[in-house]
Amino acid sequence: MAAHKRLQKEITDMLKTPPSWCSAHLVDDNLQKWKATVQGPEGSPFEKGVFSMDIDIPADYPFKPPTLKFTTKIYHPNIKTSDGAICAEVFSTWSPQLKILDVLTTIRSILTDPNPDNPLETEIAQQFKTDRNAFNKTAKEWTKKYAK
């Protein structure tokens, strides 16, 4: 019951005072299934893109982290091109004090500052390390094409 109350508060807070760069809502009034959008950060190759993701919240939240997957295609070393899975430190260092908004904030930060040393897409990570201009060009093209 405590998890239910906490999730209710988190979604209520997000709906009442959403950050300017993201939004979230429940899917079919199910507290354990959310949809979220994150705007690409200014100055990044993802700028002007709006990226959607699914959030699945486990029954033992907040003791276990939520699972987030991009549903918008994105060219990024830490996001799996085929299924939108995300590799971010927040999932491996999860603590019950963290909230869904903290996870969304972390995901937005990896759009600005990818971690090519812990990739899900090794070729994209290699390009990010060795040819940043080509990486930025492709990431901008994908953003324009998919993140409308």
Swiss-Prot record:
The active site is at C87 (glycyl thioester intermediate). Residues 2-148 form the UBC core domain. Pfam families: UQ_con (PF00179). GO terms for biological process: anatomical structure morphogenesis; protein polyubiquitination; protein ubiquitination; ubiquitin-dependent protein catabolic process. It catalyses: S-ubiquitinyl-[E1 ubiquitin-activating enzyme]-L-cysteine + [E2 ubiquitin-conjugating enzyme]-L-cysteine = [E1 ubiquitin-activating enzyme]-L-cysteine + S-ubiquitinyl-[E2 ubiquitin-conjugating enzyme]-L-cysteine. InterPro entries: UBQ-conjugat_E2_core, UBQ-conjugating_enzyme/RWD. This is Ubiquitin conjugating enzyme E2 B. It comes from Dictyostelium discoideum.
